[in-house]
Amino acid sequence: MVTIGNAHDDLIHDAVLDYYGKRLATCSSDKTIKLFEVEGTENYKLVETLIGHEGPVWQVAWAHPKFGSILASCSYDGKALIWKEQPETQQWSIIAEHTVHQASVNSVSWAPHELGAILLCTSSDGKVSVVDFNDDGTTSHIIFDAHAIGVNSASWAPLSNNNTKGKDTNSIRRFVTCGSDNLAKIWKFDSSKNAYIEEAVLEGHTDWVRDVCWSPSILIRSYIATASQDRTVLIWSQDNNGKWQKQLLTEEMFPDVCWRCSWSLSGNILAVSGGDNKVSLWKENLQGKWESAGEVE
């Protein structure tokens, strides 16, 4: 484990490696984003500080490298900013501002790159927006009501080789959102209406759902994990009839609020971070039960 000291002047809310694991982006309540070059296993060199937000920056997300060196960020200031590094000068600049929300933008997430450059944003105004960055340099967006009290996070459904062959990619745009209404919801794009339609409601938590994460498509089954203020994590999977069923990650409640959940790249390990400043790792056993696979403090 590596500790990066004195990186920000306030709380750090997110830290994400790029596609190749060569650069680390962090964001903070100090309103800045920091970029580090990863040199070896223990050396992180600060190379850039991005200044553009007017409030705490909650989350950052790297686009797939096929689109260039592009980073999205979201903030309490109600904006999502798109940053790009110019290859010739290696200087970063804002290439787009997404300002359709009326409150804090809480998360940003790029769609699977096969679908194109598409950014999903969630906000405390209760709305979700999906921004398409077109090849001609223009942008278009769809914004809709998702969770009345506020949307906290979202995660795209993975693409598998089976569901992309011979199909219009618009038909497989799906993602899951979670909100302060204690719910998670699955949305699917309807190209005939140019709108996202509610496909399923995942009801099982008794307090705000803080994070949601859809597992990668490598697995035979597809899982969704939801982490909640109620100190539980639920694992959702579809039965043979396509209905989503829930399972408690662990029968015992977590010591504190569950803030974030994240699947490993292979999709077989789930990491959960909580208000007790610990990260716990979980793995499914052969009986279909989830068991502890370690802890990071």
Curated annotation (Swiss-Prot):
Keywords from UniProt, A to Z, are: Cytoplasmic vesicle, Endoplasmic reticulum, ER-Golgi transport, Membrane, mRNA transport, Nuclear pore complex, Nucleus, Protein transport, Repeat, Translocation, Transport, WD repeat
This entry's Gene Ontology molecular function terms read:
structural molecule activity
A Gene Ontology biological process annotation? positive regulation of TORC1 signaling
Q: Name one GO cellular component term.
A: COPII vesicle coat
Q: Where is the signal peptide?
A: none
Which sections of the protein are WD repeats? 7-46, 52-93, 100-141, 146-197, 204-246, 253-292
Instruction: Tell me the membrane topology, using the record's own terms.
Output: Peripheral membrane protein
Cellular location(s)? Cytoplasmic vesicle, COPII-coated vesicle membrane; Endoplasmic reticulum membrane; Nucleus, Nuclear pore complex
SMART domains membership = WD40
| Name of a matching Pfam family | WD40
Q: List residues traversing the bilayer.
A: none
Family, according to the entry, reads as follows: Belongs to the WD repeat SEC13 family.
- Write out the function statement from the record: Component of the coat protein complex II (COPII) which promotes the formation of transport vesicles from the endoplasmic reticulum (ER). The coat has two main functions, the physical deformation of the endoplasmic reticulum membrane into vesicles and the selection of cargo molecules. It also functions as a component of the nuclear pore complex (NPC). NPC components, collectively referred to as nucleoporins (NUPs), can play the role of both NPC structural components and of docking or interaction partners for transiently associated nuclear transport factors.
Q: How does it assemble?
A: The COPII coat is composed of at least 5 proteins: the SEC23/24 complex, the SEC13/31 complex, and the protein SAR1. Component of the nuclear pore complex (NPC). NPC constitutes the exclusive means of nucleocytoplasmic transport. NPCs allow the passive diffusion of ions and small molecules and the active, nuclear transport receptor-mediated bidirectional transport of macromolecules such as proteins, RNAs, ribonucleoparticles (RNPs), and ribosomal subunits across the nuclear envelope. Due to its 8-fold rotational symmetry, all subunits are present with 8 copies or multiples thereof.
Q: What is this protein called?
A: Protein transport protein SEC13
Q: In which organism is this protein found?
A: Debaryomyces hansenii (strain ATCC 36239 / CBS 767 / BCRC 21394 / JCM 1990 / NBRC 0083 / IGC 2968) (Yeast)
